[in-house]
Design a protein with these regions (language model features):
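Acidic-glycine-rich active-site phosphate/pyrophosphate-binding loop
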Residues: 24-38, 101, 116-127, 279-280
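A structural signal for isolated positions on well-ordered beta-strands in alpha/beta enzyme cores
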Residues: 18, 76-78, 223
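FAD-binding subdomain of flavoenzyme oxidoreductases
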Residues: 127, 136-139
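Acidic/His- and Gly-rich active-site-bordering loop/insert found
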Residues: 1-43
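Acidic/histidine-rich catalytic neighborhood of metal-dependent amide-processing enzymes
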Residues: 41-42, 46-123, 161, 170, ...
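Metal-dependent amide/peptide-bond hydrolase catalytic core
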Residues: 116, 133-136, 144-319
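Glycine/charged-rich beta-loop-alpha catalytic/anionic-binding loops adjacent to active sites
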Residues: 33-46, 129-132, 289-290
Length: 319
């Protein structure tokens, strides 16, 4: 699979606690990356998501060994692959370790606070299929880009709730590969997100109705591909769980007034969907995630490392 796993055995009698930082980034292979330091920040694509958390997790491992600290429970350090887009690495790890994990901490995201639940995320690719042809051909005078454009305009007029937190995005679209051809396949993607599976379902139905109407209006057919689906990850009562209470206490002990939210979107969701108590947090404040201008503050990382170390000791238990 490609996951890298290290187990620091406890002396016994404590929980099995997983700390996860993902190895992949959203950037394509071949991108030339050179980190630069300016005004107390390090700048490089992927430096925040998720390099800073890999660095912090490795630092805590070295610190535990250097101080010869023993914990009652096992500390399992997992560096996962393919977090971006499909959670493939964490799904494999969780599936292989069913019933063996007590707490799962995904290091990915916020610095001052943490998440205890995950949003639902559904990705689709919608296609309008038409006859195509040359610009001057005798096929209908429009290409599949027409119902595509009309649909996108109407979809963006839908009311997307802000409470509970929900999002809609059309990120990709395509059609003919040349200027002088009518598109025979006009397609676009939709990214739906919400902490409510019911809201995602409602938006799905509204979008499906729009697509059907626009396909009928132009005499074309349509099809939908499901690219990826991940339901909202919520464990009833988890806000008051032992893990969340300990995580909040650790943050407050370090001087944070932590925002505690239910809008996670990372490996933590996979653990939650498997019924494992899980949170996600991060080791340092960063900006411009998923952009070439991504950057992180350097100085706060030291406090972030302390936070992760305290979480490890508080959850696994000191011998």
């Amino acid at each position: 699979m490609g996951n890298l796993i290290a187990v620091r055995k406890g002396t016994g009698g404590g929980p099995a606690v997983v700390f996860d930082a993902h190895l992949d980034t959203v950037f394509q292979p071949g991108l030339k990356i050179k980190a630069t330091v300016r005004n107390g920040r390090v700048h490089a694509p992927g430096v925040g998501d998720d390099t800073r958390n890999i660095e912090a997790l490795l630092a805590t491992m070295r610190a535990l060994n250097a101080a010869n600290i023993r914990t009652k429970g096992d500390l399992i350090f997992v560096f996962t692959v393919e977090e971006e887009t499909n959670f493939k690495g964490v799904k494999h790890f969780v599936e292989e370790n069913k019933g063996k994990i007590d707490h799962y901490i995904a290091l990915d995201g916020g610095y001052e606070g943490f998440t205890y639940a995950g949003i639902g995320i559904n990705w689709y690719r919608h296609h309008f299929i038409g006859p195509g042809g040359h610009t001057r051909s005798r096929t209908p005078p429009y290409s599949a880009s027409l119902p595509l454009a009309r649909s996108i305009s109407r979809i963006y007029e839908l009311k997307v709730p802000t409470s509970p937190p929900s999002n809609l995005n059309i990120g990709m679209l395509g059609g003919s590969e040349v200027v002088n051809a009518k598109a025979s396949d006009g397609w676009f993607t939709v990214d739906l997100r919400s902490t409510s599976n019911e809201i995602i379902g409602s938006l799905e139905k509204q979008i499906a109705a729009i697509l059907e109407e626009e396909a009928k209006r132009t005499g074309m057919s349509m099809k939908t591909e499901m690219i990826s689906t991940s339901p909202a990850a919520v464990i009833p009562g988890h806000r008051d769980s032992q893990l969340v209470k300990i995580a909040e206490a650790v943050h407050r002990a370090l001087g944070f007034d932590p925002p505690i939210t239910n809008t996670g979107s990372n490996n933590s969701s996979v653990a939650l969907l498997a019924g494992i108590s899980s949170i996600s947090t991060g080791a340092g404040p960063c900006a411009d995630a998923h952009a070439l201008t991504e950057n992180c503050e350097i100085e706060p990382l030291y406090l972030g490392i302390k936070k992760i170390l305290l979480l490890e000791l508080a959850l696994a238990g000191l011998e």
